[in-house]
């Protein structure tokens, strides 16, 4: 199976918005669901519905997210995934800039990983997917 990259999804992890989009994609791909379903969910949420910022996603109703996730096959996971996506978007909106500043100042990849793991529904697999591309791009972004 082909590894999905940020580039495959049209994501440039060069700023906070790109970090959010890649985190969203990594979150979806980190679930026990086929990667094609996760990619389709990302495309519907971001490309079709324009939920491409933490604030836009946070302002989406739980029932709307359940419906959108259900369209692509998250039937077993739609309730919990929708709830966790709302939590993720709110926490990213509140904390991402500070986390990026801390990463830039201290080059603290482990601290950034711990922050990612603090999200409900984010486990080692999601962090692995995110860090595969996210860390390299972030360190280049911050000149380290």
Predicted features along the sequence, with ranges:
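A generic alpha-helix surface/boundary motif
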Residues: 22, 39-40, 110
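Short Gly/aromatic-enriched secondary-structure transition segments
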Residues: 41-45
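Catalytic DNA-binding helix-loop module of base-excision-repair DNA glycosylases/AP lyases
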Residues: 28, 107-144
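Intrinsically disordered, low-complexity, charged terminal extensions of DNA damage-control enzymes
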Residues: 1-9
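Alpha-helical ds-nucleic-acid-binding substructure associated with the helix-hairpin-helix region
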Residues: 48-120, 132
């Amino acid at each position: 199976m082909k590894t999905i990259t940020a580039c495959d999804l049209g994501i440039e992890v060069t700023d906070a918005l790109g970090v959010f989009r890649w985190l969203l994609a990594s979150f979806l791909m980190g679930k026990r669901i086929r990667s094609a379903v996760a990619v389709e969910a990302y495309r519907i949420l971001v490309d079709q519905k324009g939920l491409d910022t933490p604030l836009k996603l946070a302002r989406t109703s739980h029932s709307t997210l359940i419906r959108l996730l259900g369209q692509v096959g998250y039937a077993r996971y739609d309730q919990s995934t929708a709830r966790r996506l709302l939590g993720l978007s709110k926490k990213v909106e509140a904390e991402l800039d500070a986390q990026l500043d801390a990463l830039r100042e201290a080059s603290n990849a482990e601290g950034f990983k711990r922050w990612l793991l603090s999200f409900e529904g984010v486990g080692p697999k999601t962090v692995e997917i995110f860090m595969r591309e996210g860390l390299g791009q972030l360190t280049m972004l911050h000149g380290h």
